[in-house]
Curated annotation (Swiss-Prot):
Recorded GO MF terms: ATP binding; cyclin-dependent protein serine/threonine kinase inhibitor activity; magnesium ion binding; non-membrane spanning protein tyrosine kinase activity; protein tyrosine kinase activity
Cofactor-binding details, from the entry: Binds 2 magnesium ions per subunit.
EC numbers on record: 2.7.10.2
Name of the molecule in the record: Wee1-like protein kinase
Every Protein kinase domain range: 239-517
Cystine connections: none
Phosphoserine: residues bearing it: 23, 25, 27, 52, 168
Active site: 361 (proton acceptor)
Gene3D superfamilies attached to this UniProt entry: Phosphorylase Kinase, domain 1, Transferase(Phosphotransferase) domain 1
Record keywords: ATP-binding, Cell cycle, Cell division, Kinase, Magnesium, Metal-binding, Mitosis, Nucleotide-binding, Nucleus, Phosphoprotein, Transferase, Tyrosine-protein kinase
Length: 609
């Protein structure tokens, strides 16, 4: 018993000495360590005024078992629900506990979190020391744990950035030092993060400023949205599937009818889920290219795209004429029809090249045709009075029964890339030039010209094309066979487009202005008749507008004259006199075809002249 008392006295003595050492040491301006002041607030309340309160380690109030349980529950509430209490469970052990007492791993982890919160609170106090002294004392006495990984950053609306838009291409063209860009972003991120973390101890203005800085970070460094984040259900809800148009390597194309507008569309759906796979970038690349290039008459029109069940779906224009590949399976095309194909495709290709983009997969399977839906309507509304004068009765009759009026369009833009920052994925080797297979991307425009030239060669009867072997090399070494069904000029043009050196191939603009594609030679009689009908219809509409404009001008003149008369009553009398005088002057002589009784100077009456 004596040994226990001496041990207790030694522990109390050590505690007293530690308290004295802390009291003698000069108080620094930094935050003091956390003190074990358990139930100290209740003890201070019970101390009468004027009496000096004793330290809780020297004299502690005697508590009953019920009060002890209430005290422990109060301490547990201050520590937080579910957190391990920093205080020992027993009052005697609590009095003997020092800061260097070993603790469990959970308490060590909680201490580290507390120290981190103390550090953040100190930084916040350094910024706002003049205005928030009370909050600093509260933070130093009872620091609050602040888990950084649970901090919720402000949610932002995000969207993809299309790399094929003119703004994106201009942004890529601006050269900028990587180190400078990294430093600016680093400074912006650090400053914004500091402001945001200290927002609890700062004013609302600082919080708003930090939030704005974080928004600037999100806007300046956009991320590509994954397909998982954009999954929506539209296919079965908005469209009714009619049949399958075609099946490719990566997707299936359906002919669908929109339930709302009743129009027919072609919806391309990927065969396999592309979200998170290696084909995700290619699917997004096709959507971006369609969104930028789908505004030309010779490019398949784009309407919308979405991700559904991790599959990519693209809503495009429905081309009722099918592909050029299906068209040349039955018969080879003649020179007249090949000129039409070349004229339409080169117009679409020239539009793509004008946007600093290249197709990189031009072939008969990716060239589609559509019938002109307005050809028969324009013939029906043609005025009857003009048919007798223009001598085009046979043309109109041929237009009524014609089904050969087609427009060729370029589709399947999955391999489209920019010439300034090319990301080339090789397409069909049967239509690619040698330099692309050798990874020479210095002249990508001419690669599309080669693909178009060999496509015309196949459509004219030069197919099927080989995938390898001597014949494959001969076609790329300038040894192009002469096709007997084509003229000499057309054979020479195809040979120039398939020249082994890219620099010697013609551009899309030079092909468009080639003499072989003149306005008269490249258009058939049916197309000329259709264009004539369209122009006459336009003239008729303009004439109707001119008549309406003349009527409006006449009404305005009458209103102006009426206003002038009402404002000037004197002018009204003058106008009346003038009208009466002019009316008298206009009155003819009263004669009925003969002069009746006209007298002369000699007073002789002349009758019956």
């Amino acid at each position: 018993m004596a040994f226990r008392q001496s041990e207790h006295e030694m522990s109390v003595t050590s505690l007293d000495s530690s308290v004295e050492l802390r009291s003698r040491s000069p108080s620094p301006q930094v935050f003091n360590p956390r003190k074990l002041r358990f139930a100290d607030d209740d003890f201070d309340k019970d101390t009468p005024e004027g009496a000096s309160p004793q330290h809780p380690l020297q004299q502690r109030p005697k508590l009953s078992s019920g009060e002890e349980q209430q005290l422990d529950s109060k301490i547990g509430k201050e520590g937080g629900d579910g957190d391990v209490s920093m205080s020992p469970p027993c009052q005697k052990v609590r009095a003997l506990r020092l800061f260097s007492t070993p603790a469990t791993p959970k308490t060590i982890l909680q201490k580290s979190t507390t120290q981190c919160s103390n550090h953040l609170s100190a930084a916040a106090a350094a910024v706002n020391a003049s205005r928030r002294s009370d909050d600093l004392f509260r933070l130093s006495e009872r620091p609050r744990s602040l888990p950084l990984h649970n901090r919720k950053l402000p949610t932002q609306d995000t969207a993809n950035v299309n790399p094929f838009t003119p703004d994106s291409l201009m942004a890529h063209n601006k050269k900028r030092c990587r180190t400078q860009f990294g430093r600016e972003n680093l400074n912006l991120n650090v400053n914004a993060m500091q402001k945001y973390l200290l927002s609890d101890a700062c004013d609302d203005d600082v919080t708003e400023e930090a939030g704005d800085s974080m928004r600037e970070i999100h806007q300046q460094a956009p991320k590509r949205l994954a397909l998982h984040d954009t999954n929506i259900s539209r296919f079965k809800r908005e469209f009714m599937q009619v049949n399958v148009i075609g099946v490719g390597e990566f997707g299936v194309v359906f002919q669908c009818v929109n339930r709302l507008d009743g129009c027919i569309y072609a919806i391309k759906k990927s065969k396999k889920p592309v979200a998170g796979s290696s084909f995700e970038k290619r699917a997004l690349n096709e959507v971006w290219a369609h969104a930028v290039l789908g505004k030309h008459d010779n490019v398949v029109r784009y309407y919308s795209a979405w991700a559904e069940d991790d599959h990519m779906l693209i809503q495009n224009e429905f081309c009722d004429g099918g592909s050029l590949h299906a068209r040349i399976q039955d018969h080879c095309l003649g020179e007249a029809e090949l000129k039409i194909v070349l004229m339409h495709v080169i117009e679409g290709l020239r539009y793509i090249h004008s946007n600093d983009l290249v197709h990189m997969d031009l072939k008969p399977e990716n060239i589609f045709s559509t019938m002109n839906p307005n050809a028969h309507k324009l013939v029906e509304v043609q005025p009857q009075q003009t048919k007798d004068d223009d001598g085009m009765d046979s043309v109109y009759e041929e237009l009524r029964h014609s089904e050969n009026l087609v427009t060729y369009k370029i589709g399947d833009l999955g391999h489209v890339t920019s010439v300034k920052e090319p990301y080339v994925e090789e397409g069909d080797c049967r239509y690619l030039p040698k330099e692309i297979l050798h990874e020479d991307y210095s002249n990508l425009f001419k690669a599309d010209i080669f693909s178009l030239g060999i496509t015309l060669f196949e459509a004219a009867g030069g197919g099927p094309l080989p995938k390898n072997g001597p014949e494959w090399h001969n076609l790329r070494d300038g040894k192009v066979p002469i096709l007997p069904s084509l003229s000499r000029d057309f054979n020479e043009l195809i040979a120039q487009m398939m020249h082994p050196y890219p620099d010697k191939r013609p551009t899309s603009q030079s092909i468009f202005s080639h003499p072989i594609l003149s306005a008269v030679d490249s258009k058939s009689k049916l197309q000329l008749g259709l264009e004539l009908t369209v122009e006459k219809r336009k003239n008729e509409i303009l004439m109707n507008k001119l008549r309406e404009a003349k009527k409006q001008i006449k009404l305005l003149e009458q209103r102006v004259n009426l206003l002038a008369v009402t404002n000037n009553p004197d002018s009204l009398d003058g106008q009346r006199c003038l009208r009466s005088f002019t009316r008298r002057m206009r009155t003819p002589f009263s004669s009925h075809g003969k002069f009746d009784s006209i007298s002369d100077r000699n007073k002789n009456v002349i009758t019956n002249i």
